From Swiss-Prot:
Listed Pfam families: ESX-1_EspG (PF14011)
Name of the protein this chain belongs to: ESX-3 secretion-associated protein EspG3
Keywords, comma-separated and alphabetical: Chaperone, Cytoplasm
Recorded phenotype for the gene knockout or disruption: Deletion of the gene impairs iron-bound mycobactin utilization and EsxG and EsxH export.
Organism: Mycolicibacterium smegmatis (strain ATCC 700084 / mc(2)155) (Mycobacterium smegmatis)
Gene designation per UniProt: espG3
Length: 293
C-alpha cells in the first residue's frame, strides 16, 4: 500500500486544484488565489509545478500523481462534508474538513500555510471521533450534570460577560448546575481549546448546510460536548454533556442525519452501553428564564 497522505503549501494546493480543473477549495480551508493579477498565473504555475516535480507529486511529463489528484478532487468536489474550526488561543486557528465523494473520504487540515490531505477509511460514526478531536488537548470526558440552555440565552450571556458582568452571577442566573460551573467558567475565561463542527452536502445543484453545529470543548476540568436540538417552538437549544466518544459520535450522527440525504452511515446504527448510561446519565435541566431589563 502506498502513501495515504500528502503535505503541501497552500500555494501548491491551489496550483494542483487549478491544473486538475477541480474547482475552488471549500471556504473553511481559506485557500484562495495566491495572485491578484491573472497575468501572474503562468509564472506562478511554472514555479509551483517545478517544486511539485521535485517532490514527486508531479511527474516529468507534468501529470499529477493519481492518488493526490483524487484527494484534491474529493475535497474540492465533496458531496458530503464536515467543516471543522479548531481554536486554541487568540489567532491560533486550525482549519479542517472531512470530505466524502462516492466511496472516498479525505481529511484536509490546514495549519498556517501548510495543508495536509489524508485518505481515510471511515466506515462508522466512531471512526470520525479521533479526526474531530485531533486539534484538541486530549482531555478525558468531564464529570458534571447535563444541562441545556436556549442558544440565544447563551449568546446573550457571552455578550454580558464580555461587557464586564460578573461571571459567577451570569452562570447562577442561567441556572448552570454547580457541578458544571468550574467547567463553564474555564470556557469563558479562555482556558480551553475547542472545535466547531458544521455539516453540509450538495443537493440538487445547491449547497445545503446545517443551521447550527456541534462543539467539543477541552477545559482543564475535562471535555465538554455541546450539541443542538430544536424545541417545538423552533428555538435552538444547546445541551451540555460530558464529551465521551460515544456522545460525540451520536451528536455528529444526529447532525448529519438532519440534512436531506440523512445519516452518513445508515447501515451502522449506533449502540449504547445502557449499564454505563444508567450509572452516569442525568436528564438535562432546561433553563428558560426571562432576561430582566
Amino acid at each position: 500500500m502506498g502513501p495515504n497522505a500528502v503535505e503541501l503549501t497552500t500555494d501548491q494546493a491551489w496550483c494542483l486544484a487549478d491544473v486538475l480543473g477541480a474547482g475552488s477549495y471549500p471556504w473553511v480551508l481559506a485557500i484562495t488565489p495566491p495572485y491578484s493579477d491573472h497575468s501572474q498565473r503562468s509564472a506562478f504555475l511554472a514555479a509551483q509545478s517545478a517544486e511539485l516535480t521535485r517532490m514527486g507529486v508531479v511527474n516529468s511529463a507534468g501529470a499529477v500523481d493519481p492518488r493526490v489528484a483524487q484527494w484534491i478532487t474529493t475535497v474540492c468536489r465533496a458531496t458530503q462534508w464536515l467543516d471543522l474550526r479548531f481554536v486554541s488561543g487568540p489567532g491560533d486557528l486550525l482549519r479542517g474538513m472531512v470530505a466524502r465523494r462516492s466511496e472516498e473520504t479525505v481529511v484536509a487540515l490546514r495549519n498556517a500555510q501548510l495543508v495536509t490531505f489524508t485518505a481515510m477509511d471511515i466506515g462508522h460514526q466512531h471512526a470520525l471521533v479521533p479526526v474531530l478531536t485531533a486539534g484538541l488537548s486530549g482531555r478525558k470526558p468531564a464529570r458534571f450534570d447535563d444541562f441545556a440552555l436556549p442558544a440565544a440565552a447563551g449568546a446573550r450571556a457571552d455578550e454580558q460577560i464580555r461587557n464586564g458582568a460578573p461571571l459567577a452571577e451570569v452562570l447562577e442566573f442561567l441556572g448552570v448546575p454547580p457541578s458544571a460551573r468550574p467547567l463553564v467558567e474555564s470556557v469563558f475565561d479562555g482556558r480551553r481549546t475547542y472545535v466547531e463542527i458544521v455539516a453540509g452536502e450538495h443537493r440538487d445543484g445547491h449547497r445545503v448546510t446545517t443551521e447550527v453545529g456541534v462543539s467539543i470543548i477541552d477545559t482543564p476540568h475535562g471535555r465538554i460536548l455541546v450539541h443542538p436540538t430544536k424545541a417545538f417552538d423552533g428555538e435552538w437549544i444547546s445541551t451540555f454533556t460530558p464529551g465521551s466518544a460515544d456522545a460525540i459520535a451520536m451528536a455528529v450522527e444526529r447532525l448529519t442525519a438532519s440534512l436531506p440525504s440523512g445519516s452518513w452511515f445508515p447501515d451502522q446504527p449506533l449502540t449504547r452501553d445502557f449499564d454505563e448510561d444508567a450509572a452516569t446519565h442525568r436528564e438535562p435541566v432546561l433553563q428558560r428564564r426571562t432576561q430582566k431589563a
